């Protein structure tokens, strides 16, 4: 029997026994800490379908999707709700360890409007700005739209709503009735990652196809009352919450690897590039502040250009090399060529780069099991520092450049063999840490009021679509806020076989002189890709 004191009436033993409530795992708790300590706002996936859908279609597919993947229908239940925010910032909570994490549960009653940000009063003001900006930009996603959405907070610990919302962007041609083909999946990262966002739209498109091709059984009453989940009615149809991925994959590093980890962490702190402006200091989000604000910039590469990039990688490295190390090399070479960032001092010889990865690849080879982890914050990643001097590659020095690409690829592969891909998150899961430290306090002290350095480069991969189907995902853009994670730069990559590859680039304001200098760098980065990919 679980101890549910402090979580009642939202958590019951019956829910736990049915598999519709459980405690969070260590990795899930990490992202919950970022949110409840106001150190992260959101990440987003922007999607364009090939044609519009109406409200009835959207309600139907959301109902089916949330029943099949209960992770999408869950919320985090904090202690002392509705006074949880004060509790989690109190000395009473922060002064001692809590080895047992909070619960998650399937939401008892969920309506269409609980999922759609357009219809929620607390977001009315920002939604008006978002809709107007999208129309002003000719119904296209731009950096201006991304910068409007980036600071939006999805509150943690609401028993009636999940950790994500869907924005339905206005349509250009409605033919007299409202349809949508442009959407934004917005989440606080709890129970979700970039791959989850891509999967969400892939699954929506498949279900829209199913409705059009085969029809769909539904109750007219459902359409009228707009209820997506009525737990008492639907619980037998709702899948069980999967175990935390940390119960399936051991993130914890061997104790023998800790001396090296702590030594490299010390070097990162004292010998790597750091920002120097007061405006780049990491901070908590608040309604009245401009904390962690960034400039964004979008780059697009057509399917033909992506094929050319892949061909050059294959020619100059080998068949197995992926896009990410090429993008990383171009990014770092362009930073060096900008000649506006690095001081070249003796105490600034490294630049750190984090590459998140999809931890689902380490799950057992069981199709049904893997499918149950389609949604969730199931990430790992490598985090290395590289010599700034190695980015100095003159124009035309192809051999040196492609050697750098191969080196980055090899380091990423090695991180799987030596455990580096999980150690950063795994250290926080060690028993002697969890049992003796308050994780909220530990992370807040480590992340807040710090200068930034380095880049986080995320590539959610290629989404392949069948364009002969009635519905398919035409385009995807992945973006995430800087938060208090101490990175100065962000580079988020997402691709479809229909419209090619999009990159959302971001820099925390104050890292470079102004937006103009940032845009100059982004253009230089684009030119660097063109130079080495022969575009």
UniProtKB/Swiss-Prot annotation:
Transmembrane segments: none annotated. Keywords: Acyltransferase, Endoplasmic reticulum, Lipid droplet, Membrane, Transferase. GO terms for biological process: acetate ester metabolic process involved in fermentation; response to toxic substance; steroid metabolic process. It catalyses: an aliphatic alcohol + acetyl-CoA = an acetyl ester + CoA. GO terms for cellular component: cytoplasm; endoplasmic reticulum; endoplasmic reticulum membrane; lipid droplet. GO terms for molecular function: alcohol O-acetyltransferase activity; N-acetyltransferase activity. Residues 19-36, 515-532 are annotated as: Membrane association. It is found in: Lipid droplet; Endoplasmic reticulum membrane. Its EC number is 2.3.1.84. The active site is at 189 (charge relay system), 193 (charge relay system). Pfam families: AATase. It is a peripheral membrane protein. Disruption phenotype: Results in an 18% decrease in isoamyl acetate formation and causes a 13% reduction of ethyl acetate formation. Leads to the complete elimination of acetyl-CoA:pregnenolone acetyltransferase activity and consequently abolishes the esterification of pregnenolone and increases the toxicity of pregnenolone. Its main location: other. Segments of the N- and C-terminal domains (residues 19-36 and 515-532, respectively) are predicted to be amphipathic helices and are essential for endoplasmic reticulum membrane association. Can use acetyl-CoA to synthesize acetate esters from various alcohols, producing ethyl acetate, isoamyl acetate, isobutyl acetate, butyl acetate, hexyl acetate, heptyl acetate and octyl acetate. ATF2 seems to play only a minor role in the acetate ester synthesis, compared to ATF1. Plays an active role in the detoxification hydroxysteroids and possibly certain phytochemicals, in association with the efflux pumps PDR5 and SNQ2. Belongs to the ATF1 alcohol acetyltransferase family. Present with 3000 molecules/cell in log phase SD medium. This is Alcohol O-acetyltransferase 2. It comes from Saccharomyces cerevisiae (strain ATCC 204508 / S288c) (Baker's yeast). The gene is ATF2.
């Amino acid at each position: 029997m679980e101890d549910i004191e402090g979580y009642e009436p939202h958590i019951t033993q019956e829910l736990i026994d049915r598999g519709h409530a459980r405690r969070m795992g260590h990795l899930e708790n990490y992202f919950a800490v970022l949110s409840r300590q106001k150190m992260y706002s959101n990440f987003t996936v922007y999607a364009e379908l090939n044609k519009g859908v109406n409200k009835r279609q959207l309600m139907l597919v959301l109902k089916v999707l949330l029943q099949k993947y209960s992770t999408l229908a869950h919320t985090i239940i904090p202690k002392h709700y509705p006074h949880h925010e004060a509790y989690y910032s109190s000395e009473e909570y922060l002064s001692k360890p809590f080895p047992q994490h909070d619960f998650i549960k399937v939401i008892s009653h969920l309506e269409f409007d609980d999922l759609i940000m357009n219809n929620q009063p607390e977001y009315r003001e920002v939604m008006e700005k978002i809709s107007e900006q999208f129309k002003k930009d000719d119904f296209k996603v731009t950096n201006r739209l991304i910068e409007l959405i980036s600071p939006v907070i999805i509150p943690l610990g609401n028993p009636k709503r999940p950790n994500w919302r869907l924005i339905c962007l206005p349509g250009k041609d409605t033919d007299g009735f409202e349809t949508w083909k442009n959407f934004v999946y917005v989440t606080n990262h709890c129970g979700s990652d970039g791959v989850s966002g891509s999967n969400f739209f892939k699954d929506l498109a498949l279900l829209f196809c199913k409705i059009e091709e085969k029809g769909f059984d539904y109750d007219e009453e459902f359409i009228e009352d707009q209820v997506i989940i009525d737990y008492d009615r639907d619980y037998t149809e709702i899948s069980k919450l999967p175990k935390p991925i940390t119960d399936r994959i051991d993130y914890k590093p061997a104790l023998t690897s800790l001396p090296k980890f702590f030594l490299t962490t010390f070097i990162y702190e004292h010998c790597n590039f750091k920002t120097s402006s007061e405006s780049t200091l990491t901070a908590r989000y608040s309604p009245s502040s401009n904390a962690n604000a960034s400039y964004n910039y979008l780059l697009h590469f057509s399917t033909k250009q992506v094929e050319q990039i892949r061909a050059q990688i294959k020619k100059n490295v080998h068949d197995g090399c992926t896009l990410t190390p090429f993008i990383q090399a171009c990014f770092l070479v362009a930073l060096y060529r900008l000649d506006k960032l690095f001081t070249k001092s003796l105490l600034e010889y490294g630049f750190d780069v984090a590459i998140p990865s999809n931890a689902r690849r380490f799950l057992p080879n069981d199709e049904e099991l893997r499918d149950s982890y389609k949604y969730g914050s199931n990430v790992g990643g490598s985090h290395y520092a590289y010599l700034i001097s190695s980015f100095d590659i003159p124009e035309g020095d192809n051999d040196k450049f492609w050697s750098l690409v191969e080196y980055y690829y090899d380091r990423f592969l090695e991180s799987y063999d030596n455990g580096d891909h999980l150690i950063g998150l795994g250290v926080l899961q060690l028993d002697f840490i969890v049992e003796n430290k308050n994780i909220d306090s530990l992370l807040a002290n480590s992340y807040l009021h710090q200068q930034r350095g380095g880049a986080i480069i995320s590539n959610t991969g290629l989404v392949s679509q069948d364009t002969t189907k009635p519905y398919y995902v035409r385009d995807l853009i992945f973006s995430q806020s800087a938060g208090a994670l101490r990175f100065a730069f962000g580079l988020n990559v997402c691709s479809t076989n229909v419209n090619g590859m999009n990159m959302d680039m971001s820099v925390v304001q104050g890292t470079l002189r102004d937006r103009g200098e940032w845009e100059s760098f982004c253009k230089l980065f684009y030119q660097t890709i063109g130079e080495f990919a022969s575009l």
